[in-house]
């Protein structure tokens, strides 16, 4: 009995040492996600009949952003001269938001507007959709997004849940084209889970159709987008300059402190350097960096407990911080100056291990804003 007890104590010590190591190396969030997924995720199998009714996109309540309605997506960084063009811009943006549904016992979001998930969606409007309000009328659907736990399941389950969520995004895009767009050019923009769905929109509804010629560009940022999906596309290419049109842009941001760390599978990803707008763009120093903008509000990352709203407030966006970072693409990832000790450090480090997933938009806010305007102007110039 004493021998068994000693073995159990030894195993426990090893587990605690491993846990401590993960936290000390900055991977505490990954450990937390793993633990929450194992102990508190939704039950299997995924049953789509348990989801709420599909949203009707003729109902304004099922849009997180509309140009006819004032919202946090209208915020402009302090000191920037862009005026309010919502409803009058010659170009639209269709923005697909990332995962904000991080807790709960269902695989897909309930569409409850009085929830922490909805507050996370508003965070995305304020800090990810807003860079496009200088060029475009902003449209962003709410949808029955996949729970964060779906990303930590076997591929079959993950694909089922994400595929279910995609059907809402597809219907929203079709409604947008048929009822809002009125033949105008548009930008497709997204982040993370939204990028997964947007890549399918490109493949299934845009490429090879007249929509590809109306699409100024696709800013499908964050997460994984492999180059090979563009091999079979007919009319959508990868952007390789600041003014290329009818093409896609993608990056996945990491600290340059981990640039020599081997990351399996990442080498096959698309990487656009947003300081040069070159595909696989090499090291670009700080001088072209147009400005990071500190995120407004709080993105709630709790993975358990109630999904009730907490009353998150959104202050006006602050002034851009210029020339703050350098950037380079290497082996499919975008590496930037380490953000430890900057206003972005805590947020950027939330995923651990040098992963700056949460900074894909904020640190390049002004670069995205100005490039979107530049591409729109190029499109309008070519269209006469």
Positions of PLM-derived features:
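Active-site catalytic motif of lipid deacylating hydrolases and related acyltransferases
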Residues: 29-51, 57, 97-184, 338-384
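Active-site signature of alpha/beta-hydrolase-fold catalytic machinery across serine-
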Residues: 19, 200-204
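Loop/turn elements at helix/coil->beta-strand transitions in domains of secreted/extracellular proteins
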Residues: 89-91, 134-138, 182-185, 212-216
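Gly/Ala-rich beta-loop-alpha elbow adjacent to hydrolase catalytic centers
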Residues: 190-194, 198
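N-terminal low-complexity, Ser/Thr- and acidic-residue-enriched intrinsically disordered segments
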Residues: 2-118
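Surface cap/lid and interfacial helix-loop subdomains adjacent to catalytic sites
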Residues: 11, 26-30, 34, 38, ...
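Active-site-proximal beta-strand/loop segments in catalytic clefts of secreted hydrolases
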Residues: 96-99, 142-146, 191-192, 220-224, ...
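Structural recognition of the beta-strand scaffold that forms the well-ordered cores
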Residues: 92-95, 139-142, 187, 217-220, ...
């Amino acid at each position: 009995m004493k021998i068994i007890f000693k073995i159990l104590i030894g195993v426990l010590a090893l587990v605690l040492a491993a846990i401590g190591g993960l936290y000390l190396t900055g991977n505490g969030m990954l450990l937390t996600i793993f633990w929450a997924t194992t102990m508190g995720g939704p039950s299997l199998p995924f049953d789509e009949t348990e989801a709420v009714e599909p949203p009707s996109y003729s109902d304004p309540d099922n849009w997180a952003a509309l140009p006819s309605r004032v919202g946090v997506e209208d915020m402009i960084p302090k000191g920037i001269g862009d005026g309010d063009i919502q409803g009058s811009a010659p170009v639209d943006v269709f923005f697909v938001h990332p995962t904000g549904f991080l807790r709960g016992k269902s695989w897909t979001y309930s569409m409850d507007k009085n929830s922490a998930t909805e507050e996370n969606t508003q965070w995305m409007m304020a800090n990810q959709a807003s860079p496009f309000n200088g060029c475009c009328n902003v449209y962003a659907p709410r949808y029955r997004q996949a729970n964060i736990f779906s990303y930590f399941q076997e591929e079959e389950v993950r694909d089922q849940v994400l595929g279910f969520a995609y059907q809402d995004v597809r219907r929203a895009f079709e409604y947008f084209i048929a009822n809002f767009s009125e033949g105008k050019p548009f930008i497709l923009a997204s982040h993370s889970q939204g990028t997964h769905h947007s890549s399918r929109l490109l493949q299934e509804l845009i490429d090879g159709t007249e929509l590809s010629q109306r699409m100024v560009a696709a800013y499908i940022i964050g997460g994984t987008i492999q180059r090979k999906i563009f091999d079979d596309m007919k009319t959508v290419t990868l952007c390789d300059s600041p003014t290329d049109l009818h093409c896609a842009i993608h990056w996945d941001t990491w600290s340059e402190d981990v640039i020599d760390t081997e990351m399996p599978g990442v080498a096959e990803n698309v990487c656009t350097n947003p300081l040069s707008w070159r595909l696989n763009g090499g090291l670009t120093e700080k001088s072209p960096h147009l400005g990071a903008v500190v995120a407004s509000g709080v993105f709630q990352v709790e993975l358990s407990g109630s999904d009730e709203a907490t009353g998150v407030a959104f202050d006006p966006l602050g002034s851009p911080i210029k020339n703050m970072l350098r950037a380079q693409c290497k082996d499919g990832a975008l590496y930037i100056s380490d953000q430890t000790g900057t206003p972005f450090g805590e947020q950027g480090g939330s995923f651990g291990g040098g992963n700056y997933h949460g900074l894909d938009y904020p640190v390049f806010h002004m670069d995205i804003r100005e490039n979107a305007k530049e591409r729109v102007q190029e499109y309008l110039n070519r269209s006469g």
